[in-house]
């Protein structure tokens, strides 16, 4: 696979988010435990039997196994600390009817739920409830069937499947089909799709949410709906309105997109000294959203070197839908400052490019996509996001570099927009960050277990976020919903959602689409059955 090497950093914090919460009332009084009542109720409301030893996990029965299941897909390790709230038990359904039954029974018994597919959400809302306790966890990891139909250029995908599994199953059937989804192959489809979902094909084909054809979803009454049954308003809301507000999607029908047999990837790293006048990073800001849509170039900025000799590296990771000869000609004309050469480029298939961007070692077999784990491991981290509308001037860049050097184990990921992202109206789906957006920033800081610098790293995120205010979007200052940040604000306890408070953080994620989301929520879930710390609120009665 040539000289291009994946950057061993951030692929798996380009994440997905699946958090669903369930209505909570005063628990039913009974001699039997809530756990027993729940299981008995589910059995009465499903036609598919299930072995308890494979579907029910409790700390009382087997704390080791319970912890193993709880931790299995949790990606942000700070939320597995002993001080964090834990579910009373975990139920892992093996059939969609058991998800329907879980909703029906939660209403009857007054149990508060969180639902998880891949566990990559930044604030752990899919497996931690700060606002309502006790709660239980519905784990969808066993609902992972994928049916690819090349003749119709489509596929049905269940929420527990990962992006890597989806990519593998597509490539298994065709070398010239793909799907515009994310870099991190261990992300679960379930939540990823609900936030819109972006990746290296976004400039050519838009978001994952832009390429959804149909769904199967369970609503607040436990009813199974498809696109025709739910209507276009609800279908619109669930393709980018964030998980946990409208229902549980049990399967997505997605549109496959054409990809060439040959894809070219490249990696070019420049230090601050090599780009002392900042011409390369400045030119990237100008052209990355305007270059032909077959090219996607993201940049990772981070500190490097020893304490006495620190610098900043800017790593340009690119993908071109075509052969390297064509790429080099385009880059020489549009972005000569990068100095891209033939030896920087590697030709490969689309599925091999997925391995490259996922951070897998060069030469890894594509079957590694079925292992479900990220090659980069898990992390203790804090992250947030911004959207940039105008190029950041040199003085602003210098302030960023200064803070990166001070932050140590921190980095920024800049993802270019433009292309198809500028052509799709911001009201097409709830994800509104379209025409006029140059690039998105991910701010990221990580630390080790029991690291005394954790509070400093969290403060670093807050400080650089404040510093960047003059250089990013405003009124509202926008953010990506799949990069949830509770520092923007959150709903309060129980079902008492303050619409005024939600108006503070809601437009950050959705801009003007937030009001439409609230209207749809009020219509389909007026009792606020599905909720979490940043779920869409219904209008007050």
Curated annotation (Swiss-Prot):
Database matches in InterPro entries: BBE, FAD-bd_PCMH, FAD-bd_PCMH-like_sf, FAD-bd_PCMH_sub1, FAD-bd_PCMH_sub2, Oxid_FAD_bind_N
Maturation and modification: The FAD cofactor is bound via a bicovalent 6-S-cysteinyl, 8alpha-N1-histidyl FAD linkage.
Signal peptide (from-to): 1-32
Record bears the keyword Secreted: yes
Compartment(s) where it occurs, according to its Swiss-Prot or TrEMBL record: Secreted, Cell wall
Co-factor remark: Binds 1 FAD per subunit in a bicovalent manner.
Domain FAD-binding PCMH-type: 83-259
GO biological process: response to oxidative stress
Cysteines paired by S-S bonds: 41-105
First-level EC class: oxidoreductase
Catalytic activity, EC: 1.1.1.-
Name this protein carries in UniProt: Berberine bridge enzyme-like 24
Organism this protein belongs to: Arabidopsis thaliana
């Amino acid at each position: 696979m040539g000289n291009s090497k994946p950057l061993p950093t951030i692929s798996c914090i380009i994440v997905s988010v699946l958090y669903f919460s369930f209505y909570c009332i005063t628990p039913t009084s009974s001699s039997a435990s809530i756990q027993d009542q729940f299981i008995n109720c589910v059995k009465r409301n499903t036609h598919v039997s299930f072995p308890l030893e494979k579907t029910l996990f409790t700390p009382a029965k087997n704390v080791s196994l319970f912890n193993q299941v709880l931790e299995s897909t949790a990606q942000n390790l700070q939320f597995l600390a002993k001080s964090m709230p834990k579910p009373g038990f975990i139920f892992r359904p093996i059939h969609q009817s058991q998800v329907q039954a879980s909703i029906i029974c939660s209403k009857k018994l007054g149990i508060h739920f969180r639902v998880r597919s891949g566990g990559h959400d930044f604030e752990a809302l899919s497996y931690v409830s700060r606002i309502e306790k006790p709660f239980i966890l519905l784990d969808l990891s066993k609902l992972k069937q994928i049916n690819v139909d090349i003749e119709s250029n489509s596929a049905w995908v269940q929420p527990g499947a990962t992006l890597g599994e989806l990519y593998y199953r597509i490539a298994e059937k065709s070398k010239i089909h793909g799907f515009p989804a994310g870099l991190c192959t261990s992300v679960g489809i379930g939540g990823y799709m609900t936030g819109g979902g972006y990746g290296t094909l976004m400039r050519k084909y838009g978001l994952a949410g832009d390429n959804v054809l149909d769904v199967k979803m369970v609503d607040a009454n436990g009813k199974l709906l498809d696109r025709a049954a739910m209507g276009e308003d609800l279908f619109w809301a669930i393709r980018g309105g964030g998980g946990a507000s409208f229902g549980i999607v049990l399967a997505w029908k997605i549109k496959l997109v054409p990809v060439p047999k040959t894809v070219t990837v490249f990696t070019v790293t420049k230090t601050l000294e090599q780009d002392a006048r900042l011409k390369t990073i400045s030119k990237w800001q100008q052209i990355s959203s305007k270059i032909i849509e077959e090219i996607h170039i993201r940049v990772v900025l981070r500190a490097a070197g020893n304490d006495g000799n620190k610098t900043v590296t800017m790593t340009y990771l690119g993908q071109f839908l075509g052969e390297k000869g064509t790429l080099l000609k385009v880059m020489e004309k549009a972005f000569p400052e990068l100095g891209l050469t033939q030896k920087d480029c590697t030709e490969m298939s689309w599925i091999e490019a997925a391995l490259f961007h996922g951070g897998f070692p060069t030469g890894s077999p594509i079957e590694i996509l079925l292992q479900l784990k990220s090659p980069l491991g898990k992390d203790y981290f804090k992250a947030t996001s911004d959207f940039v509308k105008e190029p950041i001037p040199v003085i602003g860049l210098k302030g960023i570099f200064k803070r990166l050097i001070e932050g140590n184990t921190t980095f920024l990921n800049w993802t270019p927009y433009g292309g198809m992202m500028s052509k799709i109206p911001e009201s097409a789906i709830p994800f509104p960050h379209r025409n006029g957006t140059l690039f998105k920033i991910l701010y990221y800081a990580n630390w080790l277990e029991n690291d005394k610098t954790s509070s400093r790293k969290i403060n670093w995120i807050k400080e650089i976020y404040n510093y960047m205010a003059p250089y990013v979007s405003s009124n509202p200052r926008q953010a990506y919903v799949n990069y949830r940040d509770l520092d923007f604000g959150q709903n309060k306890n129980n079902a008492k959602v303050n619409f005024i408070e939600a108006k503070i953080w809601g437009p950050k994620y959705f801009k003007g689409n937030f009001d439409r989301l609230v209207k749809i929520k009020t219509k389909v879930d007026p009792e606020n059955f599905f909720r979490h710390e940043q779920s869409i609120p219904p209008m007050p009665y």
